Every structure is written in C-alpha cells, then in structure tokens.
Amino acid sequence: LTSLSLPSDDTFSPFAETIYKQKYAQPGEEWRDTARRVVETVMKPYFPELVEEMADAVATRKFMPGGRYLYATGKRFHQTQNCLLLKVEDSRESISDLLERVASGLMTGAGIGIVWSALRPNGAKVEGMGGTSTGPIAFMQMVNEVGRHIMQGGARRSAIWAGLHWNHPDVFDFIRLKDWSEDIKAAKEKDFNAYAPMDGTNISVILDDDFFAAYEDPASEMHDWAHKVYWEVVEHMLTTAEPGFSIDVGENAGEHLRNACTEVTSSDDNDICNLGSINLARLNTKEEFARLVELGTAFLLAGTCYSLVPFEGVAKTRAKNRRLGLGLMGIYEWLVARGYRYEQNDELASWLDEYAKSTEIAARYAARIGVSAPVKTRAIAPTGTIGILAETTTGIEPLFAVAFKRRYLKGKEWHFQYVVDATARRLVEKYNLDADDIETAYDLARDPERRIAFQAWVQKWVDHGISSTLNLPSVGEQQFTHKEFGEMLYGYLPDLRGVTAYPDGSRGGQPLTVVPFWEADGAEGIEYEEIGGENACVGGVCGV
C-alpha cells in the first residue's frame, strides 16, 4: 500500500455527531466550543500560554481528552477522572466503607476497579460475630447490583472491574462466575438490560511473580493449582470471554489495582484514572507528535489540579501519585497510511520513543506549578466513545470492521445506527481499495499471536498498561486448540500487563454487530430504536 494522505476535514460523521450531541455537548455547543470550554477551563490557571495551541489540537481531533473531561468540565461538580481504583480489607468496617465509596464514585461518573483478594474465602469462620464468611464473590455481586441501578449522567452504564488473585481459595468459583446459561444469553440478545450475573463487571484473575514461580517449578506445592487456574481461565477466554488475566510482575509487582478497563494500575487505595489520547492518524510528522506529547502531558497534569473528587481519600492519593494516563489512538490507521501491516516496525518505534518522554515532561511541568511529579504517565485506553468522535481506530486496536451496527443507550432505551467505519470509508472512497480487502480485527482473529505480539511490543513504552480486546472466532470456528492458544499466550504473559479475549457471539447483546459494507453504506444517520427485539426507525429517512 502506498503512503496515504491524512484526513483534514473537521466534520463529524452522522453517527459521531449523534454521540457527541447526546453525551458531551452542552446547550448550544458545537465541537470547537467544547474544545475551547474544556481546554481553557482546565489549563488556563496553570499553563495559560498553552491554551490556544491545545484548544486547536482538540478542535482538530489531534488530541482527545477523556470522556469525563468533555462531559464534566465547567459543571458545578467537575469530577473529570474516568475511574477510581479501590482496595478492600477483610473487616466489616472496610467492606461498609467500600460500598459507600463505590456508590459515591459511580454517582459522580467514575468507573470503579476493586481487588477482592484480601477477603477471606466463602465458608471461613468469623471469630468476632460467629458464623461463616460469605466470601468475596457475594460482595462483588453486591457492587454489581449497585452499578446496575446507577446511571451515570442519566445515560452511561456504570463501569466496574473486579480482580482476584490466582491463589485465593475462591478463585475457581470466580472463574466460573460469568458462565451464563443459553437462556440468559438469549435474553441479553433481545434486551441488553435483561438481568445476567455480574453483567456490569469485567473480571480478571491476577497473576504475580509467585504464580510464574509455582507454574514453572514442579516441586512447588502450588504447581498443580497454578496449572489448573491457568488452563481453566484459558478455556473460559476461548468460550465465554471472561475472565481475563491481569499481570503484575518484576518492577510492577504489587500494582494489583486496576481501573474498569484495566489500563491504569496502582498499589495505592483511592487512586485515579486520568485519561486523554493523542490521535496518531491525524499527525504527519514525528515532530508534531512530540509536541502533542508535551501538550497532552501538561493538560492531564493540570487536570489533576482541576478535578474535584467524590471523597477525601482520593485527593490524598492523587496528591501523592498524580497519575496521568496519556494514551494513543489511531495506531492502526497510522500503520495503514504508511503501508505497514499490524506489527512492529522501526518508524513506529521512533515515534514511541517520543511518547516515552512524557515522564520527563511531566516532572518538568509539575515543578513549574509546585506539585508532585507523576509516578507514571502513560496508559493506552480502549477509547471507545472518544474513538467514535475522533473517527479513527481505537487505542492499539486494529480496524474492528468495515461496517457494523452499533448499539447505544439513549436515556433508558437502546438504539442503534449503521456505521461505516470512518477509516474504512477513507480507504474505500479516496484510495479505491476494495472493502473486502481491508484487514480487520475479524481477519486477525484467525491469527491471535499477531495481536498479542503487537500488544507486548508496544507495552515496552507504556509504564501503566494497555487495554485491548483480542477478538477471536466463535467457538465452532476457531482453527486452534485450547492447548495451542494457551501455550502461545503463556509465552507473552510476562511482557503484558493484561489480556482480554472475546470470541464472537460469546455473550448476548453485543454492542457491535458486523454487517456487509453494502448494508451500511447509505444508511448512516438513521437512528433505530430496539422494540421487543425488532427495529423501529426514530429519525432520518428509513430506507432499510
């Protein structure tokens, strides 16, 4: 593929316009107004000389602040952190305090990540009160139900992550926690709001240095346990999609806490997830990218000073760690525009070297305004909704599909629109590529090692983690055995901070459904409401 010119237009597609107006625009705003509101409010008190340059970068979608910035900046309660990372200890007081913090965090728009490993297992004796413990899973389910009934901003479902260590006695019940019956999956397919166990929570088994030592040492008393845990999770990844793995080894040992999408890590209770992403697809030169690394770092640092907090413990941890989550999006489009496949290359490595300089940049800007230097600065988020607005590929993901139906929540009702991926449309219409020839996540699903290898390679430049979903063929279509997949994956685990897989159709109510290009082409901008499993047009001209 020859080098392609990069997008220059600033006009939203119909679907991106719908999402922007529904989720982020304040009354009377257009996108440039939103960019000005967010950047001027957050940065002017700290770095006024950067406001004009950064506002233009956001207006042209070269930098995309996290969704909480777009939604909450300028509001009376401006909580602009995407997520909170929480601990719980094995006591009634700690559990009660956790539930209060969860409700407060969710109601102010933050996703929640919790590690439950400190709680004693189900059936263990409770000496003080007598009786036995319910174990961590019961409390995970309680948090999930809290999230079910809290609509963030009236439209956004609560986002929750639960982690449990591989050596916890309840880990096998945890692994099977989201084994939904066929009836439940069918109900989810008809109505995404239908009840299913833990349906608002992503779950991961946490692997640490002790796991790898036990797995490799036949003499270890935990050797068989480690193997059983690993292979049962692999089986679930390839069939039900959950749980995934979270990995904390070497210099990252002890950083077990995660945000809801798992790209931000910490060892400290009440830590934050503070996100914004550089859109590589709209950049022509490495020098421009380097400048955006500096601007984005300064913006997020200012955000740690601007954002209010849902409870006091967050302010204390934030002042100590001041974590930034400077991310990337549009990597796949950047690769295609330069004629590269979805794999490592020297040019991208040289750009990532500039990305890694955010550590030094953050320390320099922190000293200027008299705050602590961020302990870590880079995290690649999945950038789902923000990726829609940027109209490029999300995070490090390949192109999901050339065309699809995307479901979204509007109030309490589910709607969908046909979408031709903005990147795919540019390739089809401007460069005369055949839609069937564009490599997508579904094509790469047949070669999962390429996806895993690329994630492990990019992770070298990321001091937090990368949130990425490994799309796989449906259970009956996989061309590899569980053993082949598991052995391949194990070889990469020490170089990853986490891994999540999604076999096609493994859960009902998928938000994205792949459709042929011809089906979606010409049908964009029409909004459909799902009524009893059927589709009713509620806007535009209904031609399908």
Predicted regions located by residue number:
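Catalytic alpha/beta core of large soluble enzyme barrels
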Residues: 256-269, 276, 300-307, 382, ...
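Extended active-site and interfacial segments that coordinate phosphate-rich ligands
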Residues: 96-104, 120, 132-144, 178-194, ...
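Internal maturation/activation junctions in enzymes
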Residues: 297-315, 319, 330, 335-383, ...
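A structural-propensity feature for long, helix-poor, extended segments
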Residues: 121-160, 286-309, 412-453
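Function-dense linear segments that define catalytic or interfacial modules
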Residues: 21, 26, 38-47, 55-128, ...
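Conserved, charged catalytic cores of large soluble enzymes
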Residues: 2-48, 128-142, 152-254, 328-361
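Secondary-structure capping and boundary motifs in well-ordered enzyme cores
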Residues: 12, 30, 73-77, 91, ...
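Acidic/polar, glycine-rich intrinsically disordered N-terminal extensions of enzymes
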Residues: 1-80, 86, 487, 500-522, ...
